[in-house]
Amino acid sequence: MSIETYRQKIADLFAELDAVMSTDGGYKLSLSDTQKFSVAIGKRVLDKELVSNGKIPVYSANVTAPFGFIDKLLITDFSVPSVLWGIDGDWMTSYLPSDMPFYPTDHCGVLRCKTSEVNPRYLAHLLEVEGGKMGFSRSYRASIDRVQGITFTVPDISIQNNAMSKVADYEMAIKELEGSLEKIASRRSEIIRKALAE
């Protein structure tokens, strides 16, 4: 299968979850519920604090790729997954599994589940969708107060977990295909370079 086919399968799974919600109802949750969610933002990181051989990725408004690397932690407990969102850039979210240390800047929000009612990977999707509906953008910042104002409904956790297990499989297949494409591109460049050198 192609990368686009896997991406479509992921989109289809999220659409199926949305369909379950509209027919079977579900559980209503609010990100303002501090018993079920923790919502925080990071701290400012100056360029001079970044280190080329740092081990901890630093996430800023672009939460899909590290801004740089650092050798200190702001958060010390990584036993649970994290959902990141960009506060004042283009609206985007990302999911980081547990045991993956990172450092959020003051342009990056961190959302964590304290409840077993919602799958954290699914929560990243829900946050992205709901933030899009609210119009979060560079000009309409996704502040903590605004994010905590988000409410959503989720299907039974077993349905979420089943779908997110498939999403994880598809995402792994995409990474493997992207790795193969990078190797092919590198090999092609090497062949062209050798041919031009002759």
How should these model regions be labeled?
Residues S32-V154:
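DNA target-recognition domains and sequence-specific DNA-contacting regions of bacterial/archaeal
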